[in-house]
Amino acid sequence: MRILFSADHHIKLGQDKVPKEWQKRRFLMLGERLNDIFHNHNCDLHIAGGDILDVADPSSEEIELLEQFMSRLDHPGKIFTGNHEMLTKTISCLYHYAGVINKVTSGKWEVITKPYRSPEFDIVPYDEIHKAKWKPPVSKLCFTHVRGEIPPHVKPEIDLTKYNCYDTVIAGDLHSYTNSQTIGSTRLLYPGSPLTTSFHRERTKGTNGCFIIDTDTLKVEWIELGDLPQLIRKTIGAGEEMEPSDYDRVVYEVTGDVVQLKSIKDSDLLDKKINHRVTKDAKLNLVDLDMLGELELYFREVEKLSQGDIDRILARAAKYVKDYN
């Protein structure tokens, strides 16, 4: 049997700086891509390994998008829960949408609601991994949803040696293919989220994808999906143009001094303004200086203006100082 495995889709609408219509198009594009991969690689089954939804209480609009996404998958599939779909320690919101998912896929997709064991593969869903005792294994291949280790800060959420009864474990949770690891002689492989779920400084490579697994040989092929639309955050200087992208969602951090940033108009492309001129407490010797002298010293030592700019400002200020005096 040949299995397509994807996980951590994280269907979500309303994310800051991410237009809903762009996000919808991106997920439907992903659905069509996964469907093409399934058929082009002669797969027999597609398994979605948890966190297809971003939250356990999705909005009606997000459920509508889930239905549209699933309807693109015109092939047999099984879907099991991840941590993001858990309403309680034992109940997943996917259990409530099992009928909807089955209906919009014309009966081709099934939501796994309990531990699954078979000669071809086992499924240990998220609501099973924290149990003291698991249902005995049947296969040497396991599909699951579990947080592994990312040294030095991210620790496994359970004792991963519980998977040592398997030769190969295909998992959702960690969002990068590079997080694949071993547990003794057991392979713990992550395909990565098929879409970027947060903004990156540049397009990701070698991170986002899906797997094709042969259940007879346990051969695993990773397919990169980094060419799909991504979330990009760029940094530019004040005065540089914020260029929109027709494909990716690109937002901009704009750097400059206080005066420059004040002139930046709000835009849906603007992420934030960054004052790059961070100074220590100013210590200027203002003894025996009149008001114009104080201004000249401030513009030269703090604002670092050219002498020409300072002279023009002082000339304009002089008449106001005269009136003030």
UniProtKB/Swiss-Prot annotation:
The positions making up the signal sequence are none
Keywords per UniProt: Bacterial host gene expression shutoff by virus, Degradation of host chromosome by virus, DNA damage, DNA repair, Early protein, Exonuclease, Host gene expression shutoff by virus, Host-virus interaction, Hydrolase, Nuclease
User: What inducers act on this gene?
Assistant: Expressed in the early phase of the viral replicative cycle.
- Any one GO biological process: DNA repair
Instruction: Give the superkingdom in one word.
Output: Viruses
- Write down the InterPro entries for this protein, in alphabetical order: Calcineurin-like_PHP_ApaH, DNA_Repair-Maintenance_Comp, Metallo-depent_PP-like
Q: Does the keyword Hydrolase apply?
A: yes
Enzyme nomenclature, EC number? 3.1.11.-
Which GO terms of the molecular function aspect are on file?
exonuclease activity
Q: Which Pfam families match?
A: Metallophos
Complex and partners:
Could consist of two subunits: D13 and D12.
Q: What does this protein do?
A: Possible exonuclease involved in phage DNA recombination, replication, and repair.
| Protein name listed in UniProt | Probable exonuclease subunit 1
Q: Which organism is it from?
A: Escherichia phage T5
